[in-house]
Regions:
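Sec-dependent signal peptide recognition
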Residues: 2-8
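C-terminal motif of bacterial Sec signal peptides marking the signal peptidase cleavage site
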Residues: 13-14
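Substrate-recognition/specificity elements adjacent to catalytic centers across diverse enzyme folds
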Residues: 20-227, 235-238, 242-250
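Gly/Pro-rich active-site capping loops and adjacent beta-alpha segments
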Residues: 47, 52-100, 262-312, 413-469
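Glycine- and hydrophobic-rich flexible loops that cap the catalytic core of alpha/beta enzyme folds
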Residues: 237, 243-248, 254-259, 263-407
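Hydrophobic alpha-helical segments
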Residues: 242, 249, 372-480, 535, ...
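Ordered core of a single globular domain
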Residues: 343-345, 358-364, 369-371, 378, ...
């Protein structure tokens, strides 16, 4: 691509500040960093050191969309209510239940020097942008700090913490109660009716490619502006191209000169809830654990919020914690502690060094840091290897307990028993068929008959079900032969929709049997009857099927299978 704009950040000719000051450090980074934008506007960042490259990466992100960089940190560090008002205060409390600002600062101070340097370069890149662009007015954060990435080590579109219900937190911390059952059911129902989303990853070995090299399809499904596209390089071995979540200092999924990786959201069970037996007496607050009574950690969280007049106010909350995790809500009259992966320093390390691996051995060793809790990973490399890692952070559990429900926190047997190693996790390397796929689907069909077997793993390692994206991928991959890049692009955009092949014939049959003839309805059914189940930009059938599929998803078989029993009206009448 032909460069159209070149930005070279210049060192001031004279600087009276000591070298260790923030200003001097930023100017040194600027002198050692070049940002070249190609004809698509993608920044290609070149730094002398990794920290120079990170500095330039954050500067370039701010050039592209400072608002989203700031928004992500306003949310992540728990200051959303200062912008959006008191309605957001329980989002902020959720963040602080897992880590206060002081705890984040302490984690940063104790981090290895290389991680601290990357975090400092992150802050310097944003602050230098703000200093050199005085016309940019932040909503709230006018100075970024190196401890802030401790809150934002997760690059996926739906991080673990978002699975903790704000409404349940509010019910407990405002009223000391459980969320009413009807409201909890409404939350679950709303979640099931959200717009579908997902990601598709495919790795193909050289045995099936025209040039003999392995290929990787990275097809992440996010909102249009959730991530930027970047190319970031240093003289210390960093050379990664791919997607970066706004405000993070690592390429989340992409490739370097030797390895390529992508992520799909996983349904591996990585979070648990513990029902705590609370004892209050004159000595304080305790919880039962086996034969002993342990003290509940109690502290205070003070949060700011903007009131209806735009004035900043403060509100205090108690913060309760057991060794299982913070108390987040109440169930059946018992306090519930939520356990999940919370190791920001290691997570940042894993996310950054992932981008610098040059072979499968190094990549697998990186994966054994085991902090990528919300994702699966599809992998390919220049040596011809293809691999699939199902999950990454997976606690060992006693399978006699049902961890899909809150478990008894007073029973030590329910505690996590360390983490499974990568070798113990569901792992697929170079299957004989020469390809593998994951589309947020079960790992047990990743490579057809060469897939991992469910009987070899604990049930909590995969709750993932097969889906029609997975079915479609398997169908296409089973036919590949000597595929090239153009062929892979064509495969990725194949218009056939197997879900509707399964769904629409039932609708047509039901209408033929029970429908009331009418001009419009007959015409619509005839369009669907003649459809080849392929989508296109002018497909009327696709539009009809989409709306029917949405109704079917919310009402299920009630739309046509139960009408014969008189329990539901036909929705088209």
């Amino acid at each position: 691509m032909k460069p159209i704009v070149v930005f070279i950040l210049l060192l001031l000719t004279a600087c009276s500040e000591p070298l260790d000051t923030a200003s001097a450090r930023q100017e040194k980074h600027a002198a050692q960093t070049t940002i070249i934008r190609d004809s698509f506007g993608v920044p290609h960042i070149y730094g002398k050191t990794d920290t120079d490259a990170v500095f330039g990466l954050l500067y370039a992100q701010c050039e592209d969309d400072f608002q989203r960089v700031e928004d992500n940190y306003i949310w992540a560090i728990g200051r959303l209510a200062e912008v959006e008002g008191q309605s957001a205060i329980y989002s902020d409390l959720r963040a602080k239940l897992f880590m206060t600002t002081d705890e984040a600062k302490a984690m940063y101070e104790k981090a290895p020097e290389d991680i601290k340097a990357l975090c400092m370069a992150f802050a310097d890149g944003i602050n230098y942008y703000l200093k050199t662009h005085p016309e940019v007015r932040p909503k709230l954060i006018d100075h970024f700090e190196p401890w802030m990435p401790m809150y934002f080590s997760e690059g996926s579109i739906g991080g673990d913490i978002e699975r903790i219900s704000e409404k349940k937190i509010r019910a407990f911390y405002e009223n000391g109660a459980a969320l009413p059952k009807e409201e909890a059911l409404a939350i679950a129902r709303a979640a099931s009716e959200e717009e579908p989303a997902g990601s598709n990853g495919i790795a193909i070995s050289g045995a099936h490619t025209k040039n003999g090299n392995a290929m990787l399809l990275i097809n992440p499904h996010t909102s249009f502006f959730f991530r930027g596209e970047v190319h970031v390089n240093s003289e210390e071995g960093l050379a990664a191209y791919g997607a970066v979540t706004w405000g993070q200092f690592f390429v989340y999924q992409g490739f370097n000169e030797k390895t390529a990786w992508m992520h799909t959201s996983t349904y591996t069970d990585v979070m648990d809830e513990y029902l705590e037996t609370i004892i209050k007496n004159d000595s304080g607050l305790f919880y039962q654990y086996g034969e002993e009574q342990r003290e509940v950690s109690v502290s205070e969280v003070r949060l700011k919020f903007k009131d209806s007049l735009g004035i900043i106010q403060e509100k205090s909350f108690p913060k309760y914690r057991t060794h299982h995790g913070p108390i987040t809500h109440m169930e059946a009259g018992q306090w519930v502690a939520s356990a999940m992966m919370w190791d920001p320093v290691t997570a940042l390390k894993q996310s950054f060094i992932r981008t610098k691996q040059d072979n499968y051995k190094g990549f697998k060793a990186m994966m054994d840091l085991r902090t990528n809790s919300s994702n699966n990973t599809v992998y390919a490399d220049a040596e011809g290897n293809i691999a699939y890692f199902h999950g990454n952070f997976i606690p060992k559990r006693d399978v006699t307990f049902d961890f899909t429900q809150p478990v008894d926190g007073s029973n030590p047997a329910t505690d996590w028993q360390g983490l499974h190693t990568v070798e113990e996790n569901i792992l697929l390397l170079n299957p004989e068929n020469g390809w593998l796929q994951n589309c947020n689907s079960t790992p047990y069909t990743a490579a057809l008959q060469y897939s991992p077997k469910p009987e070899d793993y604990p049930v909590y390692m995969s709750k993932d079900q097969e889906n029609f994206r997975g079915v479609h991928a398997i169908s296409l991959l089973s036919e590949i032969n000597q595929i090239d890049l153009d062929g892979l692009i064509t495969l990725a955009h194949d218009p056939f929709l197997p879900a509707f092949e399964a769904l629409i014939p039932g609708l047509v049959s039901a209408f033929d049997q029970w429908g009331q003839p009418s001009g419009e309805m007959n015409a619509a059914i005839e369009v669907l009857r003649q459809w080849d189940f392929k989508t296109s930009e002018d497909s009327v059938a696709m539009t009809l099927a989409h709306f029917y599929g949405t109704l079917y998803g919310t009402k299920g078989q009630a739309t046509f299978c139960h009408v014969r029993y008189g329990t539901h009206d036909l929705f088209w009448q």
